[in-house]
Regions:
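Low-complexity, Lys/Gly-biased intrinsically disordered segments
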Residues: 45, 63, 76-119, 134-138, ...
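Short, ligand-facing micro-motifs at secondary-structure edges
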Residues: 93-95, 117-130, 148-172, 187-192, ...
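A short glycine-rich beta-alpha junction/loop motif
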Residues: 153, 168-176, 185-188, 208-228
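Short amphipathic coiled-coil heptad-repeat segments
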Residues: 1-24, 30-31, 41, 49, ...
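Amphipathic alpha-helical segments
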Residues: 4, 15, 75-76, 186, ...
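Short, solvent-exposed loop/turn positions at domain surfaces
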Residues: 69, 136-137, 209
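Residue-level "contact hotspot" at macromolecular interaction interfaces
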Residues: 142-143
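Non-catalytic DNA-recognition/assembly elements of restriction-modification systems
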Residues: 9, 18, 64-94, 222, ...
């Protein structure tokens, strides 16, 4: 069984609105999106975030006339920018502030590099850190609450995970912070969408085709996403995790079976070379006679160090 393909099929059904049934009592995603937009405008007005220079399509215009596929009537097509604040460590912050002199395992705030971001999971970093004081100076690229992280350059381009926010961390180069404007979106749903074949196709389709492929923050903001009602997002995530857990069990079972098969083969060979796999037949020609026929000059040697063989 191709469990990788099975996982992708589950994600494909999920993002098409076919994994769980729709509930007519759910608040439509169009209303949800307006709530999120209002929260975004509040954050901009309070100066907590800045409006991007190249803003995505205005909320006053219809979204995506050429949508990738049809979604249930309670869903809506949108993009990352209308749901998340997207930023990275600015170049001057890295060259001026994050230097060999300021990075040490003895500091308080771990920095998050591309190697800490794997597709679907976060790898905690304990080797490099900056001081709390320096992190406070670079508040924009600090990691203080749950958000998505995406590698935007190099071999792992498009790898996305959820930052668990167990402690304050800080962005290093090559990783984008994708922070929700509101708690009215399930981060796990957004993660699963970006992990799907369609989500990854979108990432690869907009990456710059150079020797070292890369994504700009503007292109990440433009990534399309099919948004279900919030209650349905939760149901989708619960169903995905239930099915993925079953696949994990299948994969573990396959691994255990392969181990058993390998051990069994080894045991069979061990029994065979010790003369214990099949019974000896007294009518068989002794092996010493066979050797004499193969090599007439053969002289048997009684080596006390050799194991005793079957008679």
């Amino acid at each position: 069984m191709d469990t990788k393909a099975l996982r992708q099929k589950i994600l494909d059904l999920a993002i098409h609105g076919k994994l769980v049934p729709q509930d007519p009592n759910d608040e439509p995603a169009s209303v949800l999106l307006e709530r999120i937009k209002a929260e975004k405008e509040r954050l901009i007005k309070e100066g907590k975030i800045k409006r991007s220079k190249k803003s995505a399509k205005s909320s006053d215009t219809p979204h995506y006339e050429n949508v990738p596929f049809e979604v249930p009537s309670s869903w809506v097509w949108t993009n990352i920018e209308e749901l998340f604040f997207v930023t990275k460590l600015a170049g001057f912050e890295y060259t001026d502030c994050l230097t060999k002199d300021t990075i040490s395992s003895n500091n308080e705030v771990p920095i998050v590099r591309a190697q800490n971001v794997r597709m679907g999971y976060f790898v905690e970093n304990t080797n490099e850190a900056i001081s709390e004081a320096l992190s406070q100076q670079l508040e924009r690229s600090a990691l203080t609450k749950k958000c998505l992280l995406m590698t935007f350059i190099g071999a792992g381009i498009g790898d996305t995970c959820i930052f668990p926010a167990l402690k304050r961390c800080h962005l290093a180069p090559n990783v984008a912070k994708i922070e929700p404007y509101s708690n009215k979106i399930d981060l796990k749903y957004a993660l699963y969408y970006l992990m799907s074949d369609l989500g990854q196709l979108g990432v690869r389709g907009i990456s710059k085709s150079t020797a070292q492929p890369s994504l700009s923050m503007a292109t990440i903001r433009s990534l399309e996403i099919a948004l279900p009602p919030l209650a349905e997002q939760h149901r989708i995530v619960a169903e995905i995790e239930k099915l993925f857990e079953l696949i994990d069990q299948i994969e573990q079972g396959k691994a255990d079976l392969q181990t058993i098969i390998k051990q069994t083969k080894s045991k069979i060979l061990d029994l065979a070379i010790h003369g214990k796999l099949v019974p000896q037949d007294p009518n068989d020609e002794p092996a010493i006679e066979l050797l004499k026929r193969i090599n007439p000059d053969f002289t048997p040697c009684d080596n006390g160090h050799s194991r005793k063989l079957p008679q």
